[in-house]
Structure formats: structure tokens, C-alpha cells
């Protein structure tokens, strides 16, 4: 049961409490500042990137996908599957467009017509 307005006036319900695990108002420190503050002089690996300089590339190239060593038959099979999925997406999209058109252009409207495009 709801309380009357007079009973609710003195008790704010949605105000956060100050001691509920919220951090203090001190600004957060960067990772480099904490290292310098503790006395360690450790150079970060990405030091050049935050100064506007490009980071050094790694000496060995990384393989981004294991698909480089596929048989041509597997590639053709994958392409066929992608084509099948695109056709299915196209059919479902057309189905939704048709349903939307029917809803907007039906003669029995339970709601006012919206003239948005």
C-alpha cells in the first residue's frame, strides 16, 4: 500500500548513501603515475603510443586467421554457404517489409496514422 504524500516527504528513497562502497572524491591516477609514486622506474611498453608516436611493430608477423591454409574446395563450400545465408537474410527482410507495409496500409486501424517515413 502506498504512503500518503505527507509520510513520503521526509524520507528520500532514491538518494545514494555516501558510505556504500563509493570511492572517495580523489581523481584516479594513471598507471604511469602510480609507478613513479612508488619509486619504481619501469618503462611502459606502449610509451611511444601515448605521446603521438606510432608504436613499434612486433618483429615476427602474427597469423590473423588460420583460414590461409584451406583447400580451394573448402573455400568454395564457405562461399556457397555465405550465398545461401545472404539469400535467407534477403527473404526474411522482404517478409518483414511486406508485413510492415500491410500493417501501415490496412483499412482497419486501431491506432492513428503516423505520417513518418
UniProtKB/Swiss-Prot annotation:
GO cellular component, one term: nucleus
Domain of life, source organism: Eukaryota
Entry protein name: Transcription elongation factor A protein-like 8
Keywords: Coiled coil, Nucleus, Transcription, Transcription regulation
Coiled coil: 73-100
Biased composition (Basic and acidic residues): 41-82
Localization per record: Nucleus
Pfam families cross-referenced by the UniProt entry: BEX (PF04538)
Reported function: May be involved in transcriptional regulation.
Entry similarity comment: Belongs to the TFS-II family. TFA subfamily.
Region (Disordered): 1-82
